[in-house]
């Protein structure tokens, strides 16, 4: 199955469900580290809203691509805590928080809402009562009424594309990115161009719909997987998909996966540079950039001395976010073998140390008028 349409991607793009060993809920520690690095930006965004003369009675906030797990709860707690702090400082009365949790229809909303406790949202008698609603659907379309959101947050979601890039087969129907699932050193220039073009189209669409939904001067905090280097085929940018492609190729060589399935599969994700992100925002013209920065974190927990333990932990993280979309192409029955092979490749690469993972923090304000 080629991920050539939005409909197909929307069906299979979600994190591993439940609370089992391979679930996203149990393997989201890396994205938790990323979110903690961006927490000051979120706190500052909430504080900024109180200085923009909104005359707030209720703050409407949305977490787009929320998945299911502790990271979502931390976002709610941070917003609520900052609102309570500002209310005490400004002596606000009857201020409420409405949080909308959004993701695609395949997301595990049951696990998400089962995890919501009074510790996260508090009770309705507190100084800032919190109300939480689920909003299933694609954030590449309209989700909310016009001028209704004060704050938009999204972590590690916007780098996912609506579909595999267009134009990755020749006129004769031959795969142009043969043996790979993402941009690599062996990919022809057309592959890089197609990925950037698809990201430009999708991110522009994302900004356009958010500009319709957000109030003037509303704040948006985005965290996305990105890259520091200029070259998108640099291993620092693409190593996860490169190693996964090697694991798939190993199973192809063993006759366990059809080679054509590998050649026709391209992951619908793009790790943009800061310059590319900034350029798209400026071209769109709906938002001002209040802050943009990139930072690197270790891809594997370096505190653990045993390289096999480190490799297995990294595999669980990758499996949690990649298995649904990978299994849709190569079959559920082969997944244990595939990720076992991936672990072996990761462990061998640990000898040379895996590259760090780059994330981008982007803080935007909607332009008035």
Swiss-Prot record:
It catalyses: 1,7-dimethylxanthine + S-adenosyl-L-methionine = caffeine + S-adenosyl-L-homocysteine + H(+); theobromine + S-adenosyl-L-methionine = caffeine + S-adenosyl-L-homocysteine + H(+); 7-methylxanthine + S-adenosyl-L-methionine = theobromine + S-adenosyl-L-homocysteine + H(+). Pathway: Alkaloid biosynthesis. It holds the Pfam family Methyltransf_7. One of its GO terms (molecular function) is caffeine synthase activity. Transmembrane segments: none annotated. InterPro entries: MeTrfase_7 (IPR005299), MeTrfase_capping (IPR042086), SAM-dependent_MTases_sf (IPR029063). Mg(2+) binds at residues 177, 263, 265-266. Binds 1 Mg(2+) ion per subunit. Its cofactor is Mg(2+). S-adenosyl-L-homocysteine binds at residues 24, 66, 71, 103-104, 138-139. Keywords: Alkaloid metabolism, Magnesium, Metal-binding, Methyltransferase, S-adenosyl-L-methionine, Transferase. Caffeine is catabolized to produce theacrine in Camellia sinensis var. assamica cv. Kucha, but not in cv. Puer. This is 3,7-dimethylxanthine N-methyltransferase TCS1.
